[in-house]
Amino acid sequence: MPLYLKAEKIQSWRVLIMACAGFIFNTTEFVPVAMLSDIAQSFDMQTADTGLMMTVYAWTVLIMSLPAMLATGNMERKSLLIKLFIIFIVGHILSVIAWNFWILLLARMCIALAHSVFWSITASLVMRISPKHKKTQALGMLAIGTALATILGLPIGRIVGQLVGWRVTFGIIAVLALSIMFLIIRLLPNLPSKNAGSIASLPLLAKRPLLLWLYVTTAIVISAHFTAYTYIEPFMIDVGHLDPNFATAVLLVFGFSGIAASLLFNRLYRFAPTKFIVVSMSLLMFSLLLLLFSTETIIAMFSLVFIWGIGISCIGLSLQMRVLKLAPDATDVATAIYSGIFNAGIGAGALFGNLATTYLGLNEIGYTGAALGLIGFIIFITTHLKYRHTFLLQNK
């Protein structure tokens, strides 16, 4: 095998390892969605109240993303990844032995700390270790890893939780994380910090209105999604009257939609980035608006969830790629801010979903999310029209 092909194969394996790391981080972030009812029963709580686990996790990431990124900005990336995985594993061990809900929240905050740095560096890191001329495909591979978290992580986590308890689910995640950490130690090269940015980058980024409005759009649109998604399990069971096994199958469909979104992103995004985002947001709003109606038949719900998953997955990929293009001189800092704001959206969405469930009823979460999605859509369109020339320059 020619040396350049051998080197490219090794690089591809490294990208795959990072995709597996993304899988495990995304699995643990969202697996509580599939186990809210079981966790609530364990601690004798209301399901809506245990949904605040998502809020605490997300807001920990929001608060810590930028300061943690600045504190670790000059660290060699391989050693930083290893330290993050150690924190991640310790957090899951604490989750397994949590003797009350507050200890579980503390464990989730520990995991969220590792998350805050991991997702700040991962996108730019994957671009660095990927083969030449395959940067977009590498980001797509990372996206597939995160999508598989929904396909495999959430349904399997739910099944394990139902059979032997939610604590075992967190224990299995810890074991998988340990395995991935050993692969990182063995296969990843030393990676000095590069174009990470520093605290001096903040005033420069603040002078880029297109980037700032992109952050605002991200917060609102992600809030719209998680207003409904956080409570999708109790919605399907209590409102849709689905058997719990069908609820697991719906989560599986959502995950497969993430892979479809990754393929669409790889093929279509580069040709018309703005149109791609507009269509993706439209799919999200359409799905949330019709969520309640989809409970009439199983086929309707499966179809709607698939479309919903494509919409939100394409939005996440597109906005992250846009951030990287708008801040090539400070990728890690810009991505850290994006990660924090993304998780602010998750936390806000979980909170809005909780409020909608408490004061309006569980059946109203789709309408609440759709209203938020419309606000985000209007902001994005308005921003695009105002900074049209900047959009065109950034995509030349």
Curated annotation (Swiss-Prot):
TM helices/strands, residue ranges: 15-35, 51-71, 84-104, 109-129, 137-157, 168-188, 209-229, 245-265, 276-296, 297-317, 333-353, 365-385
Keyword DNA-binding listed: no
A GO term, aspect molecular function: carbohydrate transmembrane transporter activity
Topology in the lipid bilayer: Multi-pass membrane protein
Keyword Cell inner membrane part of the UniProt annotation: yes
PROSITE patterns, alphabetized: MFS
Keywords (A to Z) from UniProt: Cell inner membrane, Cell membrane, Membrane, Sugar transport, Transmembrane, Transmembrane helix, Transport
Location in or out of the cell: Cell inner membrane
Family annotation (InterPro entries): MFS, MFS_dom, MFS_Efflux_Transporters, MFS_trans_sf, Sugar_effux_transptr_put
Gene Ontology CC entries for this record: plasma membrane
Main localization, broad class: membrane
One Pfam short name: MFS_1
Family assignment from sequence similarity: Belongs to the major facilitator superfamily. SotB (TC 2.A.1.2) family.
Function text: Involved in the efflux of sugars. The physiological role may be the reduction of the intracellular concentration of toxic sugars or sugar metabolites.
The protein's name: Probable sugar efflux transporter
